[in-house]
């Protein structure tokens, strides 16, 4: 997911490097599916096979969710995971395309494993990622037992996270994708990892990263755009999840100049782009970004962990090491009190 071309237009000086310590006490809405995909991609065996329990059920997502969440809490960061709901019809073509890519990757992965090509097998395995409904249910169950809030979006999770940030329910949206700005998030935190490095998509390589904070108003000012509507029109020219190809032949700089000069996609389509082909109605895309389905009433309150339930899910049902889970629970217990200016659980549960 994401509008990567748009990111190329955001100046480096707007990407404020922040430490995890500086995010102490901040409530941040995290893209749950983005996080789960990250765990499935990175927590794997040498041949690309994910971690599994004795019954062959994937557990990489649970391991990643447990330890990443605890790491964030230890820095006093309050994560609220937002799960995708029903995808919009605008996205169905792209979803089908991704499904075919995954199916081909599965075939290539199996072949590479059979031929003993571990590096290739791992590469294809990462492309073959998919999240099942069982994985999502288990992730929600783990968060519930840890006392960490999550929100079910009616449609796009990033739209829900952006809404929560725009209303002050959370301090920022946390995602790798710039879609958050198109949906109206005033503040975006990227690279919210603990290890200090991030895996390159489809490659067995890592790059050093630090969290970065970007503000929507700064982006609009730097790009000399009037409002979010113009930013959305710019993104549509470059390509979004709903029209991934954008307009052929129009790169980031030209797209920006066109929006600055003509002011809107409407005027462009009546002039220089009157012969352009749009597989998906661009005005429907714009309307979806401006008014996506969201849940207005959400509960982001933290609760006391149910340690017995964590043990039941991870140790008894999925064969996690009891000692490791016990150690993780001790860290969870201590980290729940780490909020700015307080060492009590009230700082999280209030």
Swiss-Prot record:
NCBIfam families: fen_arch. This is Flap endonuclease 1. PROSITE patterns: XPG_1. The gene is fen. Binds 2 magnesium ions per subunit. They probably participate in the reaction catalyzed by the enzyme. May bind an additional third magnesium ion after substrate binding. Structure-specific nuclease with 5'-flap endonuclease and 5'-3' exonuclease activities involved in DNA replication and repair. During DNA replication, cleaves the 5'-overhanging flap structure that is generated by displacement synthesis when DNA polymerase encounters the 5'-end of a downstream Okazaki fragment. Binds the unpaired 3'-DNA end and kinks the DNA to facilitate 5' cleavage specificity. Cleaves one nucleotide into the double-stranded DNA from the junction in flap DNA, leaving a nick for ligation. Also involved in the base excision repair (BER) pathway. Mg(2+) 2 binds at residues 177, 179, 241. Residues 1-102 are annotated as: N-domain. Residues 120-263 are annotated as: I-domain. Its cofactor is Mg(2+). The keyword Transferase does not apply. Belongs to the XPG/RAD2 endonuclease family. FEN1 subfamily. Interacts with PCNA. PCNA stimulates the nuclease activity without altering cleavage specificity. Its EC number is 3.1.-.-. It comes from the Archaea. InterPro entries: 5-3_exonuclease_C_sf, Flap_endonuc, Flap_endonuc_arc, HhH2, PIN-like_dom_sf, XPG-I_dom, XPG/Rad2, XPG_CS. The lineage of its organism: Archaea, Thermoproteota, Thermoprotei, Thermoproteales, Thermoproteaceae. One of its GO terms (molecular function) is 5'-3' exonuclease activity. Mg(2+) 1 binds at residues 31, 84, 156, 158. Keywords: DNA damage, DNA repair, DNA replication, Endonuclease, Exonuclease, Hydrolase, Magnesium, Metal-binding, Nuclease. GO terms for biological process: DNA repair; DNA replication, removal of RNA primer. Signal peptide: none annotated.
């Amino acid at each position: 997911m994401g509008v990567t071309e748009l990111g190329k237009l955001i100046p480096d000086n707007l990407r404020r490097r922040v430490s995890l310590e500086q995010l102490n006490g901040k409530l941040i809405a995290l893209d749950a599916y983005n996080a789960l995909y990250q765990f499935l991609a990175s927590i794997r065996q040498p041949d690309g096979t994910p971690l599994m329990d004795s019954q062959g059920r994937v557990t990489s997502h649970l391991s990643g969710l447990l330890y990443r969440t605890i790491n964030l809490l230890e820095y006093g960061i309050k994560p609220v995971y937002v799960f995708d709901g029903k995808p919009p019809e605008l996205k169905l073509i792209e979803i089908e395309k991704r499904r075919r890519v995954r199916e081909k990757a599965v075939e290539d992965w199996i072949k590479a494993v059979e031929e003993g090509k571990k590096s290739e097998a791992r590469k294809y395995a990462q492309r073959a990622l998919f999240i099942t409904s069982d994985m999502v249910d288990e992730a929600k169950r783990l968060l519930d037992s840890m006392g960490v809030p999550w929100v079910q979006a009616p449609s796009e999770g990033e739209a829900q996270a952006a809404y929560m940030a725009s209303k002050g329910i959370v301090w920022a949206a946390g995602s790798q994708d710039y879609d958050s700005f198109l949906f109206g998030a005033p503040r975006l935190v990227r690279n919210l990892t603990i290890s200090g490095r991030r895996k390159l998509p489809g490659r067995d390589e890592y790059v050093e990263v630090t969290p970065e904070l970007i503000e929507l108003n700064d982006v609009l000012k730097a790009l000399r755009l009037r409002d979010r509507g113009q930013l959305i029109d710019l993104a549509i020219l470059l390509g979004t999840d709903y029209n991934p190809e954008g307009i052929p032949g129009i790169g980031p700089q030209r797209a920006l100049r066109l929006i600055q000069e003509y002011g809107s996609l409407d005027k462009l389509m009546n002039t220089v782009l009157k012969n352009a082909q749009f597989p998906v109605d661009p005005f429907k895309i714009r309307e979806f970004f401006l008014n996506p389905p969201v849940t207005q009433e959400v509960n982001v309150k933290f609760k006391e962990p149910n340690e017995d339930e964590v043990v039941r899910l991870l140790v008894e049902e999925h064969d996690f090491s009891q000692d490791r889970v016990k150690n993780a629970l001790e860290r969870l217990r201590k980290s729940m009190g780490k909020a700015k200016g307080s060492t009590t659980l009230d700082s999280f549960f209030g």
